[in-house]
Design a protein with these regions (language model features):
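Thioester-forming pentapeptide GCGEQ
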Residues: 1-42, 47-48, 216-218, 224-228
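Acidic/glycine-rich beta-solenoid
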Residues: 7, 30-31, 38, 60-70, ...
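A motif-centric feature for acidic-aromatic and gly/ser/thr-rich catalytic loops and repeats
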Residues: 202, 563-636
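Short turn/helix-capping motifs enriched in Asx and small/polar residues
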Residues: 591-607, 616, 631-632, 637-638, ...
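Low-complexity, glycine/serine/proline-rich disordered segments
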Residues: 675-738, 742-744, 950-951
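Active-site or metal-binding loop neighborhoods of secreted/extracellular toxin and effector enzymes
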Residues: 694-707, 867-951
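Polybasic, low-complexity association/targeting segments
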Residues: 741-794
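Catalytic toxin/effector domains delivered as secreted proteins or via bacterial secretion systems
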Residues: 817-895
Length: 951
């Protein structure tokens, strides 16, 4: 790696006089032309209230275009979003801040309008239904919510007031029992017939039930008192069981197939003090060990082996060694378990190397591929079976990549001289957006946008292969083969309310018959069937083990049509690499079933198996995702086309990964991975997860090198401010937080009157729920602040103002548990005291619960890092001292600031009805003011003044 390529290429953020980001400068250099530097400027504009109104990347800005244009409300909420990639969306909320109306593809024939209906004012205001209407078609009620009452029977099952029947786009989900911790213990799923559409009209639930298929699927969950899941019994009676150590980390897991004996999946695990896995021993006797770089804790080694004494004999099966550059980009991967081979005067080393440009985009990669490999497309090459032993199996390849100024991959060039496997894949990018297709679909940039829907969904996979999408932007059908006068080959999909795939059906013409392959996805279970005409030829249960350490374990149980070459109830252990790709498959005896290697952006470079039949049952491949018959990789919220290195549709999470909504993992697919099709993550997070290891900085690690202490202001003045109660959300908008400090001084019984119930919650280390509003403070010199204020029995009518909003409270040095996805009127905010050296951090305790902690300064180890503290599945997000405790002055000097404020808010993406995410919002407050007291002064009319100390 040439260090000079990266020298003098900083990322620069330019702020206006309001402190708002208006320019982002990056400097691009390519290793082939290091003497050439391209300054790339991303431009942003804000309206008079400080809300973002326009954003343009370097490529579109140069053409006088924008990536995004926003119309914002007075509170800073986005009402209209016009995206070059994803089209126009309209979002309206009701007076309570709830979703009311969303229009996607607005202004086009593809427009879809969704509206929400709620309970009336005499009830908690929970959602009752969602109505969906495609332009020119009749409206359909696509979701219904039915809630439990308050009977003794319902209370016994903890169902009172809970949504117990959710009629969604796939059918019906019924919750039959809930633990005190909020974990659903018993859930039943019924499906609509494959050809039926969801339309839950009328008010008669029995009529809705008549629309459903007769078969029901019951899943039972076993949890402890803390909400940790101890086991799952799937819809076919297979039991998965897990155990945890005293730190709450996985210590073992087991699987019992129905009517079978319990089998060990994970026999033991060893962790470091930081919670990182050091060693795993699996039920097949195979051991995987992990090595980390001491300074950075980056994973540098993954070794999988049959140890000495194993019944199949000792053998190193995979030994991956990673090397990184200083910022964490992967430079090379060696598999020391594989031999160096020689063929046609070339040395074929089991090694991959990578080169990056100054923006850390991958520009060159080398590796090995099968000697019979051809040009990569959407078809899967045949596996070499049995496992090869000669040196003619592999040859060297080089791939180079080119990108435009908007981050679009425009060309991939492949070279394997020894086999003459040389080709170039060109990608045509629109001149008005970041939409792009293979040049075989369009050669002229102005033609590209016609191949996408208004919402940014690609209409054709390959020439002649049409794509159909649901009104919610989910891929509904792919037609790989179209026949005149005959049945087409197709693959179709159905999704649940959270846009997760629940059914996949593929049809293929074979001679005079139609073969149908169907997959139904249930918790911990896939039901796969094959039919020839109307006759079932195969029925297969695939049990997907949820807790198997870093591996993925799948059990294959045939109910009918078992291949003679495979034993029934076969367990397959899949061992991955840094980004989760399935490299190595082993059976229950620790023997190799298959081995697979991938090109950087996906696609199979090497694939060998001990039998072709066993190879056919491998479905999990690149990045640990399922590969469909279409060649697409299914990630959860999107589909990925590896042959062009692009997503098939615009990012439903919006600009969470930048202005380019089609770019794959920032064009760095070796270092970063995407868990569900929304945002890339470094693989330093917990394996098979988008969660961090639970560790926050302590002592000197909290500091920024070269910082200076801020001035100590001895002179303080006491001034009076006029205060007016305002809507809480008006003080929490991003544009408001940019310019007005949010103070928490009034959340103090010595400064504001509060009742005993409120005081007990404030002092409870496990937090609770309180009602809040905000008070806007101003004086005649133009100073403006906002202060959080608790509304309780002692709050005067005037101070209550426009009302209150319920929110969770996380006390200093304590925590509060909140739902991953609030529903049924649960709060969507978390407040906590102000910060002066403290840390705000959120852990995912279970699939349903998040624990939010306010960790006190200099107590990081005792209150968070200690091994005895329960972190559940791992850290979601943290606001540490580095984030708010420093600022850069006009001379570029980093000054220690000390104080800040923070809260959490559950946010849904504008224009989407998908579940949202909790996000931490915080301020760094320079020379923060302190509120001394609050009092109401009456002089002919009621007003209020707040006295505060201003440094």
């Amino acid at each position: 790696m040439s260090i000079s390529l990266f020298s003098s290429t900083p990322s620069v953020a330019v702020l206006d006089n309001r402190g708002l980001l208006v320019r982002e400068l990056q400097y691009h250099r390519h290793p082939d032309t290091p003497e050439e530097t391209d300054e790339r400027i991303t431009c942003h504009q804000h309206d008079e209230r400080g809300s973002l109104s326009q954003s343009a990347d370097p490529r579109l800005h140069a053409a006088g275009l924008t990536n995004f244009t926003y119309l914002n409300s007075l509170t800073g909420a986005v009402l209209q979003s016009v995206s070059a990639d994803a089209g126009t969306s309209l979002v309206l909320s009701d007076a309570a801040g709830r979703a009311f109306l969303v229009v996607t593809g607005a202004g086009t024939e593809d427009a879809v309008t969704r509206t929400w209906q709620y309970e009336d004012d005499t009830l908690p205001g929970r959602p009752l239904s969602i109505t969906e209407q495609v332009t020119g078609e009749a409206a359909q009620i696509t979701e219904r919510f039915v809630y439990a009452g308050n009977t003794d029977a319902e209370k016994m099952l903890n169902l009172a007031g809970q949504c117990v029947s959710h009629y969604d786009t796939a059918g019906l989900v019924q919750t039959n029992s809930i633990a005190l911790s909020g974990v659903p213990l018993a859930v039943t799923r019924q499906l609509l017939p494959d050809t039926a559409e969801a339309n839950w009209v009328g008010e008669d639930a029995s009529a809705w039930n008549d629309l459903l298929d007769g078969e029901t699927f019951f899943t039972q969950t076993h949890a402890d008192a803390t909400g940790a899941v101890l086991g799952i019994t799937d819809a076919k009676g297979n039991l998965q069981r897990v155990a945890y150590d005293v730190a709450g980390l996985l210590s073992g897991s087991w699987l019992t197939l129905k009517d079978g004996t319990e089998q060990v999946i994970v026999a033991s695990l060893t962790y470091s003090a930081a919670g990182q896995k050091l060693r795993e021993e699996h039920g097949n006797g195979v051991v995987t060990t992990y090595v980390y770089e001491p300074e950075t804790q980056r994973l540098t080694g993954i070794k999988t082996e049959r140890p000495s004494g194993h019944v199949a004999g000792a053998k190193v099966l995979q030994d991956l060694r990673y090397a990184y550059d200083p910022v964490g980009n992967v430079l090379s991967v060696n598999n020391d378990a594989e031999e160096t081979r020689f063929w046609r005067n070339q040395k074929v080393v089991p090694e991959n190397t990578y080169i990056y440009d100054s923006l850390y985009q991958l520009v060159s990669a080398t590796g090995r591929e099968m000697a019979n490999a051809g040009q990569q497309g959407n078809s899967l090459p045949s596996a070499t079976a049995p496992l090869p032993t000669d040196s003619s199996a592999y040859t060297n390849y080089t791939r180079t990549y080119r990108y435009d100024r908007g981050g679009n991959l425009t060309q991939m060039r492949h070279s394997a001289p020894a086999t003459n496997n040389n080709y170039t894949t060109d990608i045509t990018v629109s001149d008005r957006s970041n939409r792009a297709v293979l040049s075989t679909l369009a050669e002229v940039p102005s033609d590209v946008d016609m191949l996408f829907s208004a919402g940014g969904h690609q209409k054709h996979l390959q020439p002649g292969q049409a794509l159909v999408w649901t009104p919610r932007g989910e891929l509904q059908k792919v037609t790989p083969v179209v026949r005149d006068g005959g049945a087409d080959d197709s693959e179709s999909y159905r999704y649940d309310a959270s846009s997760q795939r629940i059914i996949k059906t593929g049809t293929q013409q074979t001679g005079n018959n139609v073969q149908t392959q169907r997959v139904q996805y249930l918790p911990g279970l896939e039901l796969r069937s094959t039919k020839a005409g109307n006759t079932e030829t195969e029925g297969l249960q695939v049990i997907t083990v949820g807790e198997a350490g870093r591996t993925q374990v799948r059990g294959l149980h045939w109910e009918s049509g078992k291949p003679a070459e495979i034993s029934n109830n076969q367990l397959r252990w899949s061992y991955d690499n840094l980004i989760g790709s399935s490299n190595l498959e082993l059976d229950g005896d620790g023997n190799i079933i298959s081995m697979e290697e991938y090109y950087p952006y996906g696609g199979t470079a090497v694939w060998t198996a001990r039998s072709a039949v066993e190879a056919d049952y491998k479905t999990i491949r690149y990045s640990g995702k399922e590969r469909d018959a279409t060649g697409l990789d299914y990630y959860g919220y999107r589909y990925y086309q590896s042959w062009s290195g692009r997503w098939l549709s615009a990012d439903p999470a919006g600009t969470i990964d930048g202005l380019n909504l089609f770019r794959m993992v920032r064009n760095n697919p070796v270092t970063l991975m995407d868990n569900d099709g929304l945002v890339p993550y470094p693989r330093t997070r917990r394996p098979n997860s988008n969660l961090h290891e639970p560790k926050i900085d302590t002592e000197k690690d909290r500091d920024i090198p070269g910082q200076s202490k801020g001035p100590h202001l001895k002179n303080m003045t006491v001034r009076s401010f006029a205060g007016t109660p305002v809507s809480l959300y008006s003080a929490l908008g991003d544009n408001v937080l940019h310019r007005e400090a949010l103070l928490t001084d009034l959340i103090n019984k010595s400064k504001a009157a509060m009742d005993s119930e409120t005081t007990s919650i404030l002092e409870n280390k496990e937090g609770g729920i309180l009602a809040f509003n905000a008070i806007k403070l101003s004086n005649n010199t133009g100073d403006v602040f906002n202060a959080l204020h608790i509304v309780n029995k002692k709050t005067t009518e005037f101070q209550q103002g426009p009302g209150a909003v319920r929110a969770y409270w996380a006390p200093q040095g304590g925590y509060v548990d909140i739902p991953v996805h609030p529903h049924g009127g649960e709060p969507e905010l978390v407040f906590t005291p102000g910060f002066s050296g403290c840390v705000f951090v959120a852990d995912k305790l279970s699939e349903n619960t998040i624990r939010v902690r306010h960790v006190e300064g200099n107590k990081e180890d005792a209150q968070y890092n200690d091994e005895s503290i329960d972190h559940g599945l791992g850290m979601i997000e943290a606001m540490e001292y580095k984030h708010y405790g420093y600022y850069t002055d006009e001379n570029g000097i980093v000054i220690e600031n000390i104080t800040g404020s923070a809260f959490m808010r559950y946010e849904r993406e504008a224009g989407s009805d998908r579940p949202g995410k909790w996000k931490i919002k915080y301020q760094a407050i320079e020379n923060a003011s302190n509120i001394l007291s609050i009092q109401e002064l009456r002089s002919g009319f009621i007003n209020k003044k707040i006295e505060l100390t201003q440094k």
